[in-house]
Amino acid sequence: KRIDWRVRVTGEGEATVRMKALTDEESDAVEMSFPCFVHGMLKTDSFSGVVRAAKENTDSQSITIRVPEERRPDQTRLEVRYSPTLAGAMVDALPYLVEYPYGCTEQTLNRFIPTVITQRILQKMGLNLADIRDKRTNLNAQEIGNDTERAKRWKTFEPNPVFDEDEVERMVKQGVERLTSMQLSDGGWGWFSGRGERSWSHTTAVVVHGLQTATKNDVALVPGMLDRGVAWLKNYQAEQVQYLKNNLIKNVEQRKKKRTKSQADNLDAFVFLVLNDAGLIDEEMRDFLYRDRTHLSVYGKAVYGLALHSQGQAEKLAMILQNIEQFVVEDAENQTAYLNLPNGGYWWYWWGNDLEANAWYLKLLAKTDPKSDRTAGLVKYILNNRRNGTYWRSTRDTAYCIEALADYLTASGEAEPDMTIEVLVDGKLHKSVKVDSSNLFNFDNKLILEGDALTSGEHVVEVRRSGKGPVYFNAYLTNFTLEDFITKAGLEVKVDRSFYLLMRVDKETKVAGSRGQVVDQKVEKYERKKLENLDTVKSGDLLEVELTIESKNDYEYLVFEDMKGAGFESVDVRSGYNGNEMGAYVEYRDEKVALFV
């Protein structure tokens, strides 16, 4: 006969249980130790908000936080971070580009172009690169942690030339000289431009676009260098136009004798923009691109839209913007916007790159609607999706993201903040900071309240701005909560957990026997019953745990820890890859199951 005892855990630590069975003849005993954990956890509630730039001199936004009664007061902490610009965080990526150890054509270009762009913006703000060498302020208000420790990522390579203006000038000169030597005899560029190399249209367009950006930022080029590259692209575009026109020949026999092209493509759109920026407008290509706009990727549409804006083609531009808008996703909770690209069949091509597509769309919005909520949301999304902390996936997409953020900084006015930021809790002023371009990288960017400074109950946190410009802010409330029912929390990543009771069902299916006859065979079958909070289960019941994960960003690799309930044991006992649909590596531990996704 089985006998169960119900016990109550009165404290954390290790509990030793000794069971004895005593009789007059034979007796036995067993002793085991069990870990006893507190019914509680360190929990962080995250909040995001923005005080938009407006005509009104003073404006504010508020959030409401709740500090639980059942908690460890010494582990209560409220951190509020604020910034007048998120785009200014682009400077974090410069050291990566400068120190990139390889030197193909694109990498040679993007070692110095983003630094030059940033340098010119800083000069307009009355700053220089040396001013941000020892920057103390993390302008990305979404990131928590020690700003100084985060800044150490910049200094992997010492001394980093990106902060020395004389070194930057030498770096730019060397880059221009190397690109000049890599230019082929026909005026174009190849990948490495070595022996046997040929000019590639996309590579040449990338280089010419970069050199155009360089000249706009007062970089001196070798005479004729840029003109030869433009001439190569002009000839390339003329060929593509002719192929498109040949495809319109009605006589089939005559058309077969010609090289044809059925539709204008994404490369045509990129070359069209680069030549447009050189003052060369091919109206036939413009019309072909508009005719074939539905065949362009979202990336290609954004690039084409920039050229249309430059040419004053308002009607065509409005249609392109409308075409792109159907792929825009906006999230009011964390104030982001991004393109949900339908590029499952071509994501590995340059025109399917999601980061670059968002960057070029940001460049387009910086021209057409720089002060909209959507444009600011796109900036936030691009920053959120830095794959490597301070930079993105590659030198090229990092360079384009910096270029787009720089365009936004200039167009939105965020490069010239002039404001006072105040943080109030329950109407009481706790922080007041004056921010302008002179202290943008060194102002006090956070308020921290800990322990007894926060009482139990609800509190209203208000971020107030007086002056010019927006304020982006995030608040993080951390408690070691001891509540009987711990509620879920999350912002960028959310996890919902459900428990199901699995009840065995007698089920048979017909299969072929050893002689080919039809036989009934029992199969494993269960019905699922969802369990609610405080439902009771008994020892031996089989439960299924379901985790539903929602993510606002694209992540490469995450770990999810699912803490076990008291007395729960995993049915599977061997950790590793088990063929689950997510391809997750699973570790079964005493107190939790960890999923490496």
Predicted regions and their residues:
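Long, domain-scale non-catalytic interaction/scaffolding regions in large secretory-pathway
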Residues: 1-29, 40, 59-70, 76, ...
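A conserved hydrophobic secondary-structure block that centers on an alpha-helix together
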Residues: 10-14, 101-105, 152-157, 163-169, ...
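Secretory-pathway-linked proteins and extracytosolic
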Residues: 25, 29-158
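Extracellular-facing binding/remodeling surfaces
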Residues: 90-100, 181-193, 283, 287, ...
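Well-ordered alpha-helical scaffold segments within catalytic/enzyme domains
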Residues: 96, 113-128, 146-165, 206-219, ...
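Residues within HEAT/ARM-like alpha-solenoid scaffolds
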Residues: 106-113, 163, 167-170, 198-206, ...
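Intrinsically disordered, low-complexity acidic Ser/Thr-rich regulatory segments
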Residues: 147-172, 177, 258-262, 520-536
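Core helices of alpha-solenoid repeat scaffolds
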Residues: 172, 185, 222-226, 230, ...
